[in-house]
Amino acid sequence: MTGERGLTYAEAGVDIDAGNAMVEAIKPLVRSTRRPGADAEIGGFGGLFDLKAAGFKDPILVAANDGVGTKVKIAIETGRHDTIGIDLVAMCVNDIVVQGAEPLFFLDYYATGKLVPGVGADIVRGIAEGCRQAGCALIGGETAEMPGLYDGSDYDLAGFSVGAAERGALLPRPGIAPGDLVLGLPSSGVHSNGFSLVRRIVAASGLGWDAPAPFAPGRSLGEALLTPTRIYVRPLLAALKATGAGAIKALAHITGGGFPDNLPRVLPEGVGIALDLDEIAVPPVFGWLARTGKVAEAEMLRTFNCGIGMVVVVAADRIASVEAALREAGEAPVRLGRITPRGEAPVTFSGSLAL
């Protein structure tokens, strides 16, 4: 080809070579997520998964996608990018396991104004860690460099996961009724919801991300707030397997909307949930947020998980076996309340949060 040299894609702000270099850098991370059904090799046009090799006989597929909201902004402003990928995986696979399904594979979308391969590799390092925790394979993704759409090297993330359950094993199960008991599984902190409010409170406090965290001795504020979302997949799948059909009737991932908005999603018509807030060991971060931002308890409950990241609805006569199975899997279940006849509100509270 001859002729006068014109503009190049790189001069327009898109560096294909940087993208290719990043793909090569992350291949070992991706391979570390191999599992039955997937070899976790990337570079082709699509990722493959073999359901038969994964051991399923008559599966129903379950899909979920999510992001991590403005928690990404804290990762960007602190320069800490190696755990935000764990959050991305958690937000998707926790939504899959509440259906009674095993997460099988994961794909990510990473969009940025300017691709910095080291940052991208750190993000994928977290994604791979999340996939290993969940037992799912990272089989593909997309890195999009879009100058002019994002400011500098700012970025956003989205995740996509697919899981499977044998036909007839899906949750919630029919028969949720008054008298069933409700367990809570502790969160690691704020997880990945409510960060627009978190960032507003931090700004009002006058603290920088590198300041000592008032609620976490020995850690900076940014580091503490970036604590990754817990992934509940392995303990919940272990408990479902150990206790058999009918013991665990429903699971609810406590994300945006908190208890009031997420619990009704798994309830049939005519029943509600009564929770005793006195039973929750509220992590110190929530007390600091509530006091510093003067956030009312009702707003805390509808914005944050307040210390409980997953709720488990259990048949009353199977409660001991479910608690034992969860403890055996490393969880610390808390008895939060019970299923009741539906009143004016589907979720009612007694006691108060220790904020």
Curated annotation (Swiss-Prot):
**Which pathway?**
Purine metabolism; IMP biosynthesis via de novo pathway; 5-amino-1-(5-phospho-D-ribosyl)imidazole from N(2)-formyl-N(1)-(5-phospho-D-ribosyl)glycinamide: step 2/2
InterPro entries linked to this entry: PurM-like_C_dom, PurM-like_C_sf, PurM-like_N, PurM-like_N_sf, PurM_cligase
Broad enzyme group: ligase
Protein's organism: Methylobacterium nodulans (strain LMG 21967 / CNCM I-2342 / ORS 2060)
Cite the source lineage. Bacteria, Pseudomonadati, Pseudomonadota, Alphaproteobacteria, Hyphomicrobiales
Q: Give the protein's recorded name.
A: Phosphoribosylformylglycinamidine cyclo-ligase
Domain of life, per the record? Bacteria
Q: Which gene encodes it?
A: purM
Where does the record place a coiled coil? none
The family note in this entry says: Belongs to the AIR synthase family.
The keyword ATP-binding is annotated on this UniProt entry: yes
